[in-house]
A protein has these predicted regions:
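N-terminal helix-loop segment corresponding to the beta1-alpha1 unit
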Residues: 1-123
Length: 123
C-alpha cells in the first residue's frame, strides 16, 4: 500500500531490474512517490547488493555486506524474492502485474518471454 506523496503517488511499479540503469530508473519513480515493488532472485538478490566498497555500516559502526550503491539505488522500494524460473513465481508476477500500473525490466531482449513474462504475454 502506498501512502507516499508526490507526483506519482498512487502509481504501482513492478521492478524487474538489476544492476545499474534499471534500478536507477525505478529509484526516480519511487522518489516521485510511486509504490515500487522490486523483484529479486531468491538467495542472492540484485547483483549490486555486494558491490565493492563503500559498504553500509551497522548500528555499531561495523561494515556490513550491503553496498552503499545498492541501498541508494533501491531506496523508496519494497523488495521481495520471487523465482522467475518457477511456475509458481511466474504466476505471482502475473498477479502483481494485474494490479500494477507500470512494469520496468532490463533483461536481455526475449529473456522474460522464455518464462511467459514478456510484453506479449503480459499486455
Amino acid at each position: 500500500m502506498n501512502n507516499k506523496t508526490g507526483a506519482l503517488s498512487g502509481v504501482t511499479v513492478i521492478d524487474l531490474t538489476w544492476v545499474l540503469a534499471g534500478p536507477y530508473c525505478t529509484q526516480m519513480l519511487g522518489d516521485l512517490g510511486a509504490d515500487v515493488i522490486k523483484i529479486e532472485r531468491p538467495g542472492s538478490g540484485d547483483d549490486t547488493r555486494k558491490f565493492a566498497p563503500p559498504f553500509v555500516t551497522d548500528n555499531e559502526g561495523k561494515e556490513t555486506t550491503e553496498s552503499a550503491y545498492f541501498m541508494s539505488a533501491n531506496r523508496n522500494k519494497r523488495s521481495v524474492e520471487i523465482d522467475l524460473t518457477s511456475k509458481a513465481g511466474q504466476n505471482i508476477i502475473r498477479k502483481l502485474v494485474l494490479e500494477a500500473d507500470v512494469l520496468v525490466e532490463n533483461f536481455k531482449t526475449g529473456n522474460l518471454s522464455k518464462y511467459g513474462l514478456g510484453y506479449d504475454d503480459l499486455k
